[in-house]
Swiss-Prot record:
Alphabetic keyword roster: ATP-binding, Kinase, Magnesium, Metal-binding, Nucleotide-binding, Thiamine biosynthesis, Transferase
Binding site for ATP: 125, 178
Record organism: Lacticaseibacillus casei (strain BL23) (Lactobacillus casei)
Reaction(s) catalysed by this chain's protein: 5-(2-hydroxyethyl)-4-methylthiazole + ATP = 4-methyl-5-(2-phosphooxyethyl)-thiazole + ADP + H(+)
Gene3D superfamilies in alphabetical order: 3.40.1190.20
Keyword Transferase: yes
Swiss-Prot/TrEMBL cofactor(s): Mg(2+)
Domain of life: Bacteria
Enzyme Commission identifier(s): 2.7.1.50
GO biological process annotation, one example: thiamine diphosphate biosynthetic process
Protein name: Hydroxyethylthiazole kinase
Upper lineage: Bacteria, Bacillati, Bacillota, Bacilli, Lactobacillales
Pfam families hit by this protein: HK (PF02110)
Length: 280
């Protein structure tokens, strides 16, 4: 029998947001969405630093509370920086999120993702198609976008089973696959999250922002599963509010509204009533 997601993570939903501290999140990411990610962190009262030079790692790791590694724009130098940061994070017990952007598109990203997984990060995320490829299932994704064909009930169940298999080798890692229904899998269980609106797929960086939000919550000491569930639900609810307030506007206005809600919605006592999801 399924359980309502807010019952399972009641304490986290009640206390995680608004933040009571300002975790410093080190982001090694892509140039396309770096500004959106930095501002999203600031909007929830976290602090971003976008430092990807290995020479600075010892000093920045000593200051930061969490690490986000995003594969959105790969070069030979950035690949080496991502690998070095992953190892540094493991050695210093830094909470880490790996965002597998484009892993379904190229073998290089697939291999890099698995190299980073070997460091036992806290969270590994991607869209449904990316996570299917990562789990060695057939994926119909193109570029960095997920495919509707990968989001059927059968495909989602197949992915959940494959990710559960991965948790046997990586029991301290939580896996997130985002889509129309978001799938969260860890050694502790499987959860479906059901908030969001289609417009969130229509502007770039939404998945990157979710990764940053997860890292921020990990930086406050929240456990992996709770950080993922709360961050995904919160961002999707921000999108729902923005869509409701922007019925006649365009996508640019919707984007602005969603980002605005990051700094507003947590102060609304009834936002938890919006959350939809279940534990399987």
């Amino acid at each position: 029998m399924s359980k309502v997601i807010t019952d399972v993570f009641y304490t986290a939903f009640k206390t995680a947001l608004p933040l009571t501290s300002s975790p410093l999140v080190q982001c090694i990411t892509n140039e396309i969405t770096v500004e959106s990610m930095a501002n999203a962190l600031l909007y929830i009262d976290a602090k971003p630093v976008m430092a990807d030079d290995q020479r600075e790692f010892p000093e920045f790791f000593a200051q930061s509370d969490a690490l986000l590694l995003n594969l959105g724009h790969i070069s030979e130098v950035r690949q080496q920086n991502l690998l070095a940061a992953g190892k540094f994070a493991q050695a210093t017990n830094q909470p880490t999120v790996i965002d597998l952007v484009g892993v379904s598109a190229t073998q290089l990203r697939y291999d890099l993702g698995h190299q980073l997984l070997a460091n036992h990060p806290n969270v590994v995320k991607g869209n449904i198609s990316e996570m299917r490829r990562f789990a060695d299932l057939k994926s119909t994704g193109r570029g960095v976008d997920g495919s509707q064909l990968d989001q059927s009930a059968t495909a989602l169940g197949e992915l959940a089973a494959s990710l559960q298999q991965l948790t046997q080798a990586f029991p301290t890692t939580t896996f997130l696959a985002t889509g129309k229904i978001d799938l969260v899998v860890s050694a502790k269980g499987t959860w479906y999250l059901k908030n969001g609106v289609p417009q969130l797929d229509r502007f770039t960086g939404t998945g990157d922002i979710v990764g940053a939000l997860i890292a921020a919550l990990l930086g406050t000491g929240l456990d992996n599963d709770a950080a993922v569930v709360v961050a995904v639900s919160y961002f999707n609810c921000c999108g729902e509010v923005a869509a409701a307030q922007n019925r006649t506007g365009g996508l640019a206005a919707f984007r602005e509204g969603t980002l605005n809600q990051l700094s507003l919605l947590a102060a609304t006592a009834d936002w938890l009533q919006m959350v939809k999801g279940e534990a399987l």
